[in-house]
């Protein structure tokens, strides 16, 4: 009997790792997260697009582990802000002070609504973008894969 293939998810989010593990277990694929590799620190996202950041993370982890890696990058693009916050979504309001008990997500939303309130006639169209990359070690045949999905919507007050 063959051992299951191991795939690394470039994340420390236990929920994401568990969910992907459940999906891929049907195919005899074992999923590990970055916590299984304590020598891998945070990977700096230096890309200019969601695709570049996802690919950068997957390539880095594959080089360090020798395993196939899946990585993602995601965020919000607001048309009235020329696509901002974009790849900076998670850190959008890091330059704003936190209110008592306010989470980073809440602070990001507060900043976004404040910026949009100064543009009362601007459209509120926006989209959530998620890009995923799968990278294989050099010794495996096939090409790396990058995909992009979007969910269109509007920003409400």
Where are these regions (language model features)?
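Anionic-ligand binding patches
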Residues: 2-8, 14-33, 38-157
């Amino acid at each position: 009997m063959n051992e299951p293939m191991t795939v690394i998810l470039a994340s420390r989010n236990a929920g994401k790792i568990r969910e992907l593990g459940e999906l891929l277990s049907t195919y005899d694929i074992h999923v590990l997260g970055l916590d299984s590799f304590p020598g891998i620190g945070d990977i700096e996202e230096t890309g200019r697009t969601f695709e570049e950041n996802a690919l950068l993370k997957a390539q880095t982890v594959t080089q360090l582990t020798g395993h196939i890696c899946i990585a993602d990058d995601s965020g919000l693009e607001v048309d009235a802000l020329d696509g901002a916050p974009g790849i900076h979504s998670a850190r959008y309001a890091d330059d704003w002070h936190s209110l008592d008990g306010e989470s980073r997500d809440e602070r990001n939303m507060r900043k976004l609504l404040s910026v949009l309130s100064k543009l009362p006639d601007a459209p509120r169209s926006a989209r959530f973008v998620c890009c995923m990359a799968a990278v294989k070690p050099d010794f495996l045949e096939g090409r790396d894969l990058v995909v992009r999905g979007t969910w269109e919507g509007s920003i409400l007050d």
